[in-house]
Curated annotation (Swiss-Prot):
Cysteine pairs bridged by disulfides in the record: none
Domain Core-binding (CB): 16-121
Name of the protein described by the UniProt record: Tyrosine recombinase XerS
Sequence ranges assigned to domain Tyr recombinase in this UniProt record: 169-354
Regulation of its activity: FtsK is required for recombination.
UniProt source species: Streptococcus pyogenes serotype M12 (strain MGAS9429)
Lineage, uppermost ranks: Bacteria, Bacillati, Bacillota, Bacilli, Lactobacillales
Length: 356
């Protein structure tokens, strides 16, 4: 979603929210949470507040009038009823016959509510320096995790990674072969953004940064002499990320055309730009997802930017056998998250042995 459209949608949701949600929004913006995260959270709050009114758990005539007392006095049974509603409600997607939301979506809804309740009961201060209330009912609501062993997950993910020589082969394919099958009109569009698209793919494969971190990258955050970029990690922490050397040429080629091709001025801070009717804008997450999907599908299999992150992590673990190093590269505080890559690499080693 384009940044301008995203901000418009955020303002639409803010206009109907209670004052304490607006306080929450302002507080998290200062962390900073990304606009995309805050937008998703606001959507979840609307879903929840709509249900409160439909279930007669508030007498408020509209969402903005739902008071803190309502949230304070909700019971565990009330929240469990909300979860059941999410699980059993007819799907709003007319193309799907499945009823109810997926467990992943339900977990996301509960995560958003947990964040709001934590803010209201622990983080915010009233005039007396106390939180708005103390009872956090969300601490009593458990979420159901998807049951899958690491070995099973590794097997599912492995097919969507560009390991070994495939990392550079993918970049080489986009650079030299992709356009050969395009029409003349399509070639013109491809060539306009070729350097930028290659730079994005190379950066994701060479650093393992999250999609949001790549989107929010500014020109000042990129040091090609040191091959280091500065990103804002989850939770608002600033981090320096090393970038593998194979990405340097692609990034330099993009920088050489960035200003001229995208009409960039001094005030255009975003590193990755798109241009529409002569106006440069920060490239958004949706556009990058579509771009990566388009090229990867033509090369081998359609993947997301997150799979390119998995690719870097797996290759780095294979080269170093250090979960600590991989955790630091990905911006994780624990090595537990990187257990997945040990399973992928071990499976690759077994395959190699079987071929001896």
């Amino acid at each position: 979603m384009r940044r301008e459209l995203l901000l418009e949608k955020i303002e639409t949701y803010k206009a109907i929210m209670p004052w304490y949600v607006l306080d929450y929004y302002q507080s998290k913006l200062a962390v900073p949470y990304s606009f995309t995260t805050l937008y998703e959270y606001l959507k979840e709050y609307k879903r929840f507040f709509d249900w409160l009114m439909d279930a007669d758990l508030t007498q408020a005539p509209k969402i903005a009038d739902i008071d803190l007392s309502t949230l304070e006095h909700l019971t565990k049974k009330d929240l469990e009823a909300f979860v059941l509603y999410l699980r059993e409600r007819p799907s709003l997607n007319t193309y799907s016959t499945k009823e109810g939301l997926s467990q992943t979506t339900i977990n996301r809804t509960l995560s958003a509510l947990s964040s709001l309740y934590k803010y209201l009961t622990e983080e915010v201060e009233n005039d007396q320096g106390e939180p708005y209330f103390y009872r956090n009912v969300m601490k009593k609501v458990s979420t159901k995790k998807k049951k899958e062993t690491l070995a099973s997950r590794a097997e599912n993910i492995k097919q969507k990674l560009f390991l070994g020589d495939e990392t550079l082969a993918f970049l080489d394919y986009v650079d030299k072969e992709y356009e050969q099958k395009l029409s003349n009109r399509a070639k013109s569009s491809f060539r306009k953004n070729k350097e930028r698209d290659l730079a994005i793919i190379a950066l994701l494969l060479a650093s393992g940064v999250r999609l949001s971190e790549a989107v929010n990258l500014d020109l000042k955050d990129v040091n090609l002499n040191m091959m280091i970029i500065e990103v804002i990690r989850k939770g608002g922490k600033r981090d320096s990320v090393n970038v593998a050397g194979f990405a340097k040429g692609y990034l330099e080629s993009y920088l050489a055309v960035r200003q001229r091709r995208y009409k960039a001025e001094k005030q255009d801070l975003a590193f990755f730009l798109t241009e529409y009717r002569g106006v440069p804008n920060r490239m958004d997450a949706s556009s990058i997802e579509k771009m990566v999907g388009k090229y990867s599908e033509d090369f081998k299999i359609r993947v997301t930017p997150h799979k390119l992150r998995h690719t870097l992590a797996t290759r780095l673990y294979d080269a170093t056998k250090s979960q600590v190093l991989v955790s630091h590269q990905l911006g994780h505080s624990s090595t537990q998250v990187t257990d997945l890559y040990t399973h992928i690499v071990n499976d690759e080693q077994k395959t190699a042995l079987d071929n001896l």
